[in-house]
Amino acid sequence: MDFDTIMEKAYEEYFEGLAEGEEALSFSEFKQALSSSAKSNG
């Protein structure tokens, strides 16, 4: 599986796990949030 496929799968799971009425990040925001959190966690 390539990186984009993994990201799309993670985004789908994130999207399905949102609470009802909770605002979702766009896919690009989601990717950005993941990459910035990965950097800050060392």
Swiss-Prot record:
Subcellular localization, as worded in the UniProt entry: Cytoplasm
Protein's name according to its UniProt entry: Uncharacterized protein YdfB
Lineage: Bacteria, Pseudomonadati, Pseudomonadota, Gammaproteobacteria, Enterobacterales
Gene Ontology CC terms, in alphabetical order: cytoplasm
Lineage top rank: taxon: Bacteria
Keywords: Cytoplasm
Natural source organism: Escherichia coli (strain K12)
Record keyword Cytoplasm present: yes
Induction: Constitutively expressed (at protein level).
